[in-house]
Design a protein with these regions (language model features):
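A broad, structural micro-motif
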Residues: 35, 69-71, 117
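Catalytic strand-loop segment that frames the active site of acyl-thioester-processing enzymes
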Residues: 2-51, 164
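Hydrophobic beta-strand-centered segment that forms part of the acyl-chain substrate-binding groove
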Residues: 51-96, 100-102
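Solvent-exposed, charged/polar functional surfaces in cytosolic regulatory/catalytic domains
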Residues: 50, 77, 146, 150
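HotDog/MaoC-like acyl-thioester-processing domains
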Residues: 2-13, 18-20, 82-84, 95-164
């Protein structure tokens, strides 16, 4: 895709996600010359889909199996402006997962100086075609395991007792 660069290297699922790179396009900027706030949410999605590919999860295959993943909520905090032709690195972390709901955290950094520009998070749930919640652990153990394998200790298995 023009204007975006994705690291094509297939990595072991246990390795940390290397992040997603994006070059800011002119159409993504506003009259003030900085990136319009709505584009950050789109970049989060691009990075999240790239994270899924890295994890060995095909969004298209999930949909073929009748699983959809709507956004429950998304937020962004803007710390530093980003401008046309800037290169940014987008880091994605799967922060919480219980088999039905998956929350991602995002950090966007300027490539030129490594400064943090934006932070954010998004919450998603797994549903069937009838829009009913799906427990991946019960309905799609392979997909559930891929998520657990990739994010490892960052995730709480819902069947494990948690400390209060």
């Amino acid at each position: 895709m023009y204007g975006t660069e994705r690291k094509e290297t297939q990595m072991e699922m246990t390795e940390q996600y290397p992040g997603y790179n994006h070059r800011v396009q002119y159409y993504e900027t506003d009259q003030m010359g900085c990136v319009h706030h709505s584009n950050y949410i789109r970049w989060f999605e691009e990075a999240r889909i790239d994270w899924m590919r890295h994890c060995g999860i095909s969004y298209r295959e999930m949909e073929k199996q009748g699983i959809i993943v709507p956004v429950l909520g998304v937020e962004a905090t803007y710390r530093q402006m980003v401008h046309f032709d800037d290169l940014v690195d987008i880091k994605v972390t799967a922060a919480k997962y219980n088999g039905i709901v998956l929350e991602f955290c995002y950090e966007i950094y300027h490539q030129k100086d490594g400064k943090l520009c934006t932070t954010g998070k998004s919450r998603h749930c797994f549903l069937n075609k009838e829009a009913k919640p799906v427990s991946l652990k019960k309905e799609n153990a392979v997909l559930h395991q891929k998520i657990l394998t990739f994010i490892g200790k960052d995730v709480q298995d819902p069947d494990k007792k948690q400390d209060s």
